[in-house]
Amino acid sequence: WYPLGYNIRPKRLQTIAREAVAQYGGQLPSDEETLLSFKGIGAYTAGAIRSFAFRERAAILDTNVARVLFRVFVGRGDPKSHAMKKHLWRLSETLLPSRHVFDFNQALMDLGAMVCVARSPKCPACPMSKSCRSVKLNR
């Protein structure tokens, strides 16, 4: 539990909840800057809150989304490098549709969790396989 940060998450959630009650009447704000001011809320969580709770146009980049974007659009290199993460964030923001962002973000997360998995990805079942850089580079 400790290496994954699971031990601290409940405490951070309690702190965020207390701050939301004290300063915002129990409601989380929807603007990115304010969300990022909460200790324990980073770029991914702020984007997820804005996208899923408020249906706003906000990019997300969790492990699954990063894997999908890296494989489909990049294919080679170190997906965990700082420069690559910045590139993947920009890509995530660029690809956002103007409407149905909730569905788009959820679909990317699901694709990474169920098809474009870390080990033994199910490339033949992937709707992106025909344009996937990783598939093309590994043939």
PLM regions and their residue ranges:
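Catalytic cores of DNA base-excision repair glycosylases
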Residues: 1-124, 128-138
